[in-house]
Structure formats: C-alpha cells, structure tokens
C-alpha cells in the first residue's frame, strides 16, 4: 500500500516458502491500489537474483526491497536525491551502533598512543534493504544462481557505476524475527506514514 501512495503501481513479488499465502491474500493487488504480479523461485536465488525471473520491466528505474521491512521511508525524496546526485544505484541505509565495552586507543605510526576514548560507540551506515536502480544495471545480475544485494553492489562498483547511500530518516525495522515482528505490531499505530 505504501508504494502505491507514491505512484508505484506495478509491483513484482518474488515468492518462495509459503508464497501462495501471499498471492492468495493480495491476489492482483487491486485492493491495495496497484497491480501485483508474482514470480516463484524454485531454488533460492538470493536477495536480488529473482529479478531475472521478471519478464517485463518497462520502467527506466526500479525499486527493489526486502519484503520483511516496516518503514516510512519517503520514496519521493529517495528518488529525487537519486536523480539530483546522478546515481546509477542508491541503497537506503540505517544507522547501526556498535558499543565497545573497553577504552579504545588510537596509535600513531610509531605505535605511541595519541588519544583514547573510554567505551566509545561507533555508528555505521548499514544496508536498509531498499534499492533504487537504473534498469540498465539489471544486466549485471546473472541469469542463473544465487545473487545477493551485496554481490550486486560490488558488481556496480566494480563496473565503475555510481552507487550512493540514502540515509533513512524515519522509521525502519526488519521484521524477519518474531521479536521484531511483535515490536512492529506495537509500533505501527504510532508511525507517521
């Protein structure tokens, strides 16, 4: 439903385990304001490999996303930043904090301590599972075999294409684990969509 709010009306869904439950529930997508079509992975093809099963991609740009996410990402801003920066691909990112339980020393080239931080927390930008891609780059996906988003991003970089990150400023949660799914159910009434 969220995608259709941003004018994304043709959605392809890759199915595998218990996929018929999804297709039986959403059918052709008309109840949620879009046109849904389904492809079925006979064997696992990775997080991006199933794209090769889709026969007709008619748009110049493609959004790929993991299906086990709850987010209120602003897709319009995501697209505008992608265009403004002249990107070939954008990956939506989320901050991931890594607390270090000890003091961390920073050394110079002579191995003298030049500074230290007591129990710092480092923040990294992590893959948020949402990608905006120029259709022409889909040729980098092999026709057979498992191919993950990380493989694809490496192929994009190795090919000299422009890959940018887009920090998600709103809500994002991977609901693939039972505890996180329960959290999403508690949070959903308080999220601005």
Where are these regions (language model features)?
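Short, high-confidence coil segments that cap the C-terminus of an alpha-helix
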Residues: 8, 59, 86-87, 160-161
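Catalytic-core segments of class I nucleotidyltransferases/pyrophosphorylases
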Residues: 63, 70, 76-83, 97-99, ...
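A short, conserved acidic/glycine-rich loop-to-beta-strand motif
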Residues: 85-95
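Short, conserved catalytic or adaptor-binding loops enriched in Gly and charged residues
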Residues: 28-32, 106-108, 155-157
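Residue-level signal for inorganic ion chemistry
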Residues: 22, 54, 68, 82, ...
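Conserved N-terminal catalytic core of the sugar/cofactor nucleotidyltransferase
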Residues: 1-67, 77, 144
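A structural signal for short hydrophobic beta-strand segments in well-ordered beta-sheet cores
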Residues: 104-107, 165
